[in-house]
Amino acid sequence: MAAQRPLRVLCLAGFRQSERGFREKTGALRKALRGRAELVCLSGPHPVPDPPGPEGARSDFGSCPPEEQPRGWWFSEQEADVFSALEEPAVCRGLEESLGMVAQALNRLGPFDGLLGFSQGAALAALVCALGQAGDPRFPLPRFILLVSGFCPRGIGFKESILQRPLSLPSLHVFGDTDKVIPSQESVQLASQFPGAITLTHSGGHFIPAAAPQRQAYLKFLDQFAE
C-alpha cells in the first residue's frame, strides 16, 4: 500500500515575525503534524523596525540576515511602520505588495493543499481566499484553511465587501480565551464568514497551540483531505 502523501500547507506569519522566528514558533505544530502535513513558512515583505529603546535606539537591520528580520504584511498608518488590528486604519499600506508576494509563492512553491495564517497572516489568508472565490486568477482556492488568532481586516476598501460574502471552503479557526492581542470575539467574527466553520479554543493567549488536545483536532480536520 502506497504511503500517504503529506498535505502541503503555505503558512503566513504574523506581524513583526521573521521567517526564521515563525518557523521556530511553528516547531511544535510541525512536530505534531509530522508525516501528515508539510508546513512552508512565509513572512511578509515589509521590514518592521523594533520599537525605540529607552534612548530612542533601534536595532540595526544591516547586521540582521533577511530571514531574521521582523516583517509584516501591511501597515495601518501612512508615515509610521505600525499596525493595529482593532482600529480602523488610515491606510493599508503595503497590502498590494503582500498579495503579490503570496501569489508568487503559490506559483513558485506550490501546489499547496491548504493555507494557514497566524494573526495578521490569518487575516491575509482569509482575504486571499475571498479574492480567489471572487475570481482573482492569482489565487486558486485551496482545499482548506486554518486560521489562528485571526480577524477580519479593516479598511481594505472594495476588498472589504468581498470578505463580507460567505467563504465556501472548509475552515478550522483556533484562538485563545486569554488572547490580549486579538480578542476571541475578533476570531469568532472571522469564523462567521465561513459556513460550517470548526472552532478550536484553548485557555492560552496569542500563539499557535500544539498540545495533545489541539494535535488531535488538527489531525481530525486534516485527515478529511488525506490522499
Swiss-Prot record:
EC number: 3.1.1.1
Active site (UniProt): 119, 179, 206
One GO location term (cellular component): cytoplasm
Chain intervals for the UniProt region annotation (Disordered): 44-68
Catalytic activity: a carboxylic ester + H2O = an alcohol + a carboxylate + H(+)
Keyword Hydrolase appears in the UniProt entry: yes
Cleaved signal peptide residues: none
S-S bridge residues: none
GO molecular function list: hydrolase activity
One Pfam family hit: FSH1
Enzyme class: hydrolase
Keyword Hydrolase: yes
Record key words, sorted: Hydrolase, Serine esterase
InterPro entries: AB_hydrolase_fold, FSH-like_dom, LovG
GO BP term (any one): response to retinoic acid
Domain of life: Eukaryota
Post-translational modifications: Proteolytically degraded in response to RA and 4HPR treatment in a time- and dose-dependent manner in the promyelocytic leukemia cell line HL-60.
Tissue and organ distribution: Ubiquitously expressed.
PANTHER family recorded: ESTERASE OVCA2 (PTHR48070:SF6)
Family, as annotated: Belongs to the LovG family.
Function text: Exhibits ester hydrolase activity with a strong preference for long-chain alkyl ester substrates and high selectivity against a variety of short, branched, and substituted esters. Is able to hydrolyze ester bonds within a wide range of p-nitrophenyl derivatives (C2-C14) in vitro, with a strong preference toward substrates of >8 carbons.
Name of the protein this chain belongs to: Esterase OVCA2
